[in-house]
């Protein structure tokens, strides 16, 4: 009956331990996926997050508001509320935007799914927000049909321009085909030979602004599939249109156009025109953010200047000049430069009506780089212009100019569409060096593992070869991993950081076009260390699993001897399988990203030399998930199952023939259980508990995890080396030798008596009494005698 109760208790303990382990691992995996999907947490700003309201963000010392809000803290409304007019319902519309109606064309119409009408939200002359009249579209027309109509010379361009503007009002729905058709239609409206009305052209400007809200992928497909020069034609037509506004301007959220005319008076000598774009509370362009000044001496940027262009020209040949500012570079699809960051790259165009007799106009520019300084550091830039024939950026005639005011300066000896292609380094927050706890723990582990390996090899003849072999390989892999972790986990690029906004380190003589807007300084050594850490940690877990499998066969299956070639088989698994996993991981990543010079960052992190943390949408492709977390989780689950099985069936199994006390027996069971848990790597389950959201709880589990796992080598040394009789015997000899040497030096003239020690052990029928006696005699020999009540005294060594 008692044995049944004990068995039921052991089964209950096993079930509870298994459930707890499963819950911890399951919650840990779930938290990993959730944290990866949420993305990496951004560094906290010194300004409270509550300062900028209504979705505003704190950047470069001020609040950057969304289109719907403005003001110092983004608390002033900049939108028209929901409205209903002529049976059409409109949602909230930002100022300066056309809002589409919620009513859409029917499924049986050519324009199915598109809004039936649009409505403008604008500012009055007195600064009041007001809604304009509703413009109703034609559901029987779409962009493809309008593209065919605009080719007809007699087509009503006003109606076509209005229809295109309505059809492009919802930029989220625009496809590459829609953009191509709309671009061709707008290009015809701006064509001077079509003599479109000024109203039609102004509406076409609204269409271009709406097109620039479409996705970058859609524009890339346009550039890749368009058979004609639709984008190039539109760019040329916009330049020409900028000369026709007199001294007026047209400003939309994504594009601003301004002209300047010169009188015939004083038409001798040079003339300079300065065009400025000021920083705003949002990323959209507004009419109050652009200025033009004629007959100026030079550039004059201030703290609010985002970009400024100085056009140097000969007045007697020039009567008109025009400027165009694009909010982003989506119309300029480059084959050599790829933008990966999410900040907008403004493009500025300048054009004059110079005739062929004088092409002496030149351009000076200053740009204030607008980017997230918490995430990026300016690395370099290139002064470029858009080559219309090559359909790409070019540097001919452009050069960098040095400045001490924090602006990026360029100079070109011709006029066209200009840009500054900036490259950035990510401002990585490199972690501090390992703390004292990690250093001390790793040092103790390295020492313990080295001593364990030496001891196991030296005393291998008195041990079972298979057990010694598994333990030695486990210790070697852990030893190498700890050494690599201590001396190689930090990225040496940490020492190459420069201060934010420091343009003095830029090479002004180099004006080459970069391949991308973000750059990472390559560090092959860090990549190699990350691969080695990846490999040796997988090797460690593999030998943990092999240790569990070996003990299972020895203790549960009682296979003595082990299968033939067992050592060779487990050696190939322990060292070969992790090598295959690492090789496949690196090979796949390199094959997919080998053309990218920064391919190594798809494998490792930049902050530390370890596997890369995936982007929010890259969980499935993550090397950390498939080549580390998944195999380690499988190993831990199997090791926990074997650990519970061995603990219940072997370590904590009741033995009726025990002769020691219950206290000693329980202590031995606890030590044996800890010994098995250490070589099985059970303490790594604590890593899953570090994924909780509560900072205080996470810190506690982090310290516990660090304490148990950095000292794992020391634990193995204590449990598998210090506790052995061979080590204790050899250690006692060494201590006795050192003690005797010390005594001889301290008391050289004292004659010590010769002692003979006899030890008697009395074992009664109840094993709770254990007594020892010592007798002092003149003989140097020592003997131990064990006595019991039922037997005569027996002498033993």
From Swiss-Prot:
Topological category with respect to the lipid bilayer: Multi-pass membrane protein
The keyword Membrane belongs to this UniProt entry's keyword annotation: yes
UniProt GO BP: adenylate cyclase-activating G protein-coupled receptor signaling pathway; cell surface receptor signaling pathway; G protein-coupled receptor signaling pathway
GO molecular function, one term: G protein-coupled receptor activity
Position of the signal peptide: 1-26
Positions of disulphide bridges: 383-410, 398-412
Main location: membrane
Location of region: GPS: 383-428
Domain GAIN-B, residue spans: 275-428
Function noted in UniProt: Orphan receptor.
Family: Belongs to the G-protein coupled receptor 2 family. Adhesion G-protein coupled receptor (ADGR) subfamily.
Protein name: Adhesion G-protein coupled receptor G7
Organism: Homo sapiens
Gene name in the database record: ADGRG7
């Amino acid at each position: 009956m008692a044995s049944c109760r004990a068995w039921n208790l052991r089964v209950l303990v096993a079930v509870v331990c298994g459930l707890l382990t499963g819950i911890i691992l399951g919650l840990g995996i779930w938290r990993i996926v959730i944290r990866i999907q949420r993305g990496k947490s951004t560094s906290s700003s010194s300004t409270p997050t509550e300062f900028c309201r209504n979705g505003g963000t704190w950047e470069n010392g001020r609040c950057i508001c969304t289109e719907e809000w403005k003001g110092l803290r983004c608390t002033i409304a900049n939108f028209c509320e929901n409205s209903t007019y002529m049976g059409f319902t409109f949602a909230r519309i930002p100022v300066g935007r056309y809002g589409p109606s919620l009513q859409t064309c029917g499924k049986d119409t050519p324009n199915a799914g598109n809004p039936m009408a649009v409505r403008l939200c604008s500012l009055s002359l007195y600064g009041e927000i007001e809604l304009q009249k509703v413009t109703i579209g034609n559901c029987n027309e779409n962009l493809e049909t309008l593209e065919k109509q605009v080719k007809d010379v007699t087509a009503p361009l006003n109606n076509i321009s209005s229809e295109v503007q309505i059809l492009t009002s919802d930029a989220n729905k625009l496809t590459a085909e829609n953009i191509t058709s709309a671009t061709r239609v707008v290009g015809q409206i701006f064509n001077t030979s079509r003599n479109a009305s000024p109203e039609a052209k102004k509406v076409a400007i609204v269409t271009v602004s709406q097109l620039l809200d479409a996705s970058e992928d859609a524009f890339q497909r346009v550039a890749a599939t368009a058979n004609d020069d639709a984008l190039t034609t539109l760019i040329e037509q916009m330049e020409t249109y900028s000369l026709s506004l007199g001294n007026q301007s047209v400003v939309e959220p994504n594009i601003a156009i301004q002209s300047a005319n010169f009188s015939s008076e004083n038409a001798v000598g040079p003339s300079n025109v300065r065009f400025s774009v000021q920083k705003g509370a949002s990323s959209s362009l507004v009419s109050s953010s652009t200025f033009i000044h004629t007959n100026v001496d030079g550039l004059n940027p201030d703290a609010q200047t985002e970009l400024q262009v100085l056009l140097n020209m000969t007045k007697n040949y020039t009567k008109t000049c025009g400027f165009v500012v694009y909010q982003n570079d989506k119309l300029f699809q480059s084959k050599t430069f790829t933008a990966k960051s999410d900040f907008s790259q403004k493009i500025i165009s300048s054009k004059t009506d110079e005739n062929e007799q004088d092409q002496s106009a030149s351009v000076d520019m200053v740009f204030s780089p607008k980017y997230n300084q918490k995430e990026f550091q300016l690395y370099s830039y290139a002064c470029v212009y858009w080559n219309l024939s090559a359909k790409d950026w070019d540097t001919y005639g452009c050069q960098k100019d040095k400045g001490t005011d924090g602006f990026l300066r360029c100079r070109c000896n011709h006029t066209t569409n200009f840009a500054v292609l900036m490259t950035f380094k990510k401002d990585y927050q490199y972690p501090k060096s390992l703390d004292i706890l990690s250093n001390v723990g790793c040092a103790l582990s390295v020492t313990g593992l080295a001593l364990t390996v030496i001891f196991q090899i030296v005393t291998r003849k008195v041990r079972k070869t298979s057990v010694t072999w598994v333990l030695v390989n486990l210790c070697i892999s852990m030893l190498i991993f700890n050494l690599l972790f201590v001396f190689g986990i930090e990225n040496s690029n940490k020492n190459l950081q420069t201060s934010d906004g420091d343009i003095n380190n830029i090479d002004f003589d180099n004006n080459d076009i970069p391949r991308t807007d973000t750059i990472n300084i390559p560090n092959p050594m860090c990549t190699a260390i990350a691969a080695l850490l990846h490999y040796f940690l997988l090797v460690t877990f593999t030998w943990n699993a092999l240790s569990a499998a070996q003990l299972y066969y020895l203790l549960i299956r009682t296979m003595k001897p082990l299968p033939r070639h067992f050592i060779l088989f487990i050696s190939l698994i322990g060292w070969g399988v992790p090598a295959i996993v690492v090789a496949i991981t690196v090979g796949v990543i390199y094959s997919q990203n080998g053309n990218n010079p920064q391919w190594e960052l798809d494998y490792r992190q930049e902050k530390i030399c370890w596997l890369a943390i995936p982007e929010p949408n890259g969980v499935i492709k993550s090397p950390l998930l498939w080549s580390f977390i998944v195999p380690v989780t499988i190993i831990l689950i199997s090791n926990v199952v074997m650990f519970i099985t061995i603990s219940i069936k072997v370590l904590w199994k009741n033995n009726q023939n025990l002769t020691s006390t219950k206290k000693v027996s329980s202590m031995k069971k606890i030590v044996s259980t800890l010994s098995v848990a250490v070589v099985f790597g059970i303490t790594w389950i604590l890593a899953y508990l570090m994924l909780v959201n509560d900072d205080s709880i996470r810190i506690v589990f982090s310290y516990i995890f660090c304490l148990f796992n950095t000292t794992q080598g020391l634990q193995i040394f204590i449990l598998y080396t210090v506790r052995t009789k061979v080590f204790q015997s050899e250690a006692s000899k060494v201590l006795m030798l050192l003690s005797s040497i010390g005594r001889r030096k301290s008391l050289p003239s004292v004659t010590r008596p010769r002692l003979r020690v006899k030890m008697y052990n009395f074992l009664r029928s109840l094993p709770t009494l254990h007594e020892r006696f010592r007798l002092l005699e003149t003989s140097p020999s020592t003997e131990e005698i064990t006595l019991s009540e039922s037997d005569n005294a027996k002498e033993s060594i």
